[in-house]
Design a protein with these regions (language model features):
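Macromolecular interaction modules
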Residues: 1-250
């Protein structure tokens, strides 16, 4: 199926200064991203702005841990995701090699990024949500996403695998407003795993808390798995799509 061709993802998290931000966004959306999509193997690209925490209902039970390693860049306000058939597309050339070959103006724009962090990931599993049948944008990542990226001690990885396979992903396949859920495994970058949920809108995402989290009959297991994860800075991000348009209003 065409919708299952995009198994490789290049994900970049970063922040921007206020000064020059509008010029950067215009360049990214009008020049940089259209240019990427002309490259062999690139299937789609989507750019997101993370929502402020006060706009995001979160689960209130259990603990969540975020790395405080100073070597891990802490950008998370913008998320850029590119999809390809597999991760080799992002290995030849590497992102840094691709960027080194840009014109001077492009390199100047990229230098505005603060706390830039990237992962190249392969899709390990996918489920379709109830809204998949109505989604009109094919492989394109949804108007709203929740993206968690993390490490897990190897001793706990089998339990986390079972929890996602037996509980979380089957539950997402039934959650109103959900288009897809994808489990990702890293081939490059600090985070070794990620979970990517796709929603029709931020309001639809909030059902994740009320319809799913609050009704979790596996709460003890859920809390055990959550405690075993060490998240990237800002994870799990909830974000609205800025490009391609139309984007989801904040």
């Amino acid at each position: 199926m065409e919708s299952e061709r995009d198994r490789g993802l290049w994900i970049t998290w970063y922040n921007l200064p206020e000064q020059g931000k509008d010029d950067y966004l215009s360049w990214l959306h009008e020049t940089y991203l259209p240019g990427l999509l002309k490259r062999p193997g690139f299937l789609w690209a989507a750019h997101y702005a993370s929502l402020d925490e006060e706009k995001i209902p979160r689960r209130t039970s259990g603990a969540k841990f975020t790395t405080d390693d100073p070597a891990v860049p802490r950008g998370d306000r913008y998320i850029l995701v590119c999809g390809a058939e597999d991760t080799n597309v992002f290995g030849n050339p590497l992102p840094r090699e691709l960027h080194a070959g840009l014109p001077a103006e492009g390199r100047k724009m990229l230098a505005m990024r603060i706390g830039e962090r990237l992962n190249v990931m392969a899709e390990a599993a996918r489920v379709a949500g109830p809204e998949a049948k109505n989604y009109q944008e094919g492989m394109m990542l949804a108007p709203c996403i929740q993206l968690g990226s993390f490490q897990c001690p190897w001793q706990d990885e089998e339990d986390a695998l079972a929890w996602y396979a037996r509980w979380r992903m089957p539950a997402m396949s039934k959650l109103p407003g959900c288009i897809r859920a994808r489990k990702l495994a890293s081939v490059a970058g600090w985070a070794k795993q990620a979970i990517l949920y796709e929603f029709t809108s931020p309001d639809a995402r909030n059902h994740f808390l009320h319809s799913h989290e609050d009704g979790d009959s596996n709460r003890e297991w859920t809390d055990k798995v959550v405690r075993s994860l060490m998240h990237s800075p800002g994870s799990a991000n909830v974000a609205r799509r800025l490009w391609p348009y139309p984007f989801t209003p904040a």
